[in-house]
From Swiss-Prot:
This is 3-isopropylmalate dehydrogenase. NAD(+) binds at residues 279-291. Keywords: Amino-acid biosynthesis, Branched-chain amino acid biosynthesis, Cytoplasm, Leucine biosynthesis, Magnesium, Manganese, Metal-binding, NAD, Oxidoreductase. Its EC number is 1.1.1.85. One of its GO terms (biological process) is L-leucine biosynthetic process. Pathway: Amino-acid biosynthesis; L-leucine biosynthesis; L-leucine from 3-methyl-2-oxobutanoate: step 3/4. GO terms for molecular function: 3-isopropylmalate dehydrogenase activity; magnesium ion binding; NAD binding. Homodimer. It comes from Streptomyces coelicolor (strain ATCC BAA-471 / A3(2) / M145). One of its GO terms (cellular component) is cytoplasm. Its main location: cytoplasm. SMART domains: Iso_dh. Binds 1 Mg(2+) or Mn(2+) ion per subunit. Catalyzes the oxidation of 3-carboxy-2-hydroxy-4-methylpentanoate (3-isopropylmalate) to 3-carboxy-4-methyl-2-oxopentanoate. The product decarboxylates to 4-methyl-2 oxopentanoate.
Amino acid sequence: MSRSLNLAVIPGDGIGQEVVAEGLKVLSAVLPQDVKLETKEFDFGARRYHATGETLTDADLDALKAHDAILLGAIGDPSVPSGVLERGFLLKLRFAFDHHVNLRPSKLLPGVATPLAGQPEIDFVVVREGTEGPYTGNGGTIRKGTEHEVATEVSVNTAYGVERVVRDAFARAQARPRKKLTLVHKNNVLTFAGHLWTNIFNKVAAEYPEVTTDYLHVDAATIFLVTDPARFDVIVTDNLFGDIITDLAAAVSGGIGVAASGNINPSGDFPSMFEPVHGSAPDIAGQGKADPTATVLSVALLLRHLGYEDEAARIEDAVSADLGERGDLPARSTSEIGDTLAARVAG
């Protein structure tokens, strides 16, 4: 019996167009013959904003909702005021589709340089809460523009929101060989939110006796990410701290050029979205210089989320092999890297 994979594709801005094309190339090559790939491209980002003033409408959300998953290239352009696309598209989509798990694997792959001394063992996953914290837009200003201006940005943390992301993190830790989960917060200063996170973490931990747990203040976690990244297996943290430490994690494991991410709706009520961590890089857009590796690894995350474990592993193996050989190869274009990876996964 044939199957189908119905994918919404959002190339977005800058190099997003180029890297998404290579991600789709690899996806088409790796899928079993009985799986029909159906894609629909959506024009979101700076071009549409300038043409229509729109970022993401309710009709757009309805159209996206019909798909199994979403593949995003990059959103952002210097011609658009800061915050317009970030809040009007990225955050709006995240909240509308309840992407409350932001998944960021960090693994130092063969042939990839790290700024850390030696070649440390780096293989961990950050599970970042995606729909609460200070990103909810709960805040404001008074006396704006005066020397007495006051600005607030409220961090919203609910027991429901915290528990569901903590449970997701425990399940992921349980499925990994090391079975270790670290909670990162700042509960000695942010006592209200911090204690909510800590209490729920400890409550859920009792249901996972095989998972080793520990706690780190976020400032201590940043130190250990640099001095001893091997101590981490799975990290769970809130939206703001997760936003910060995931980029540090990417930096120590080779940079954002190889960093993939998933914005996950674990229940499957809405399609999850997968994207490279890097930005739109308008300075090199259209020149064939962008490395599509992070997008290809995001495709692997997408496939694993949808249950295509073998295909995801083949992509990851192909990327590892390709990265390990790059030192002996001349520079390649975006499409040449995609061609190589597609050929590897096709066998």
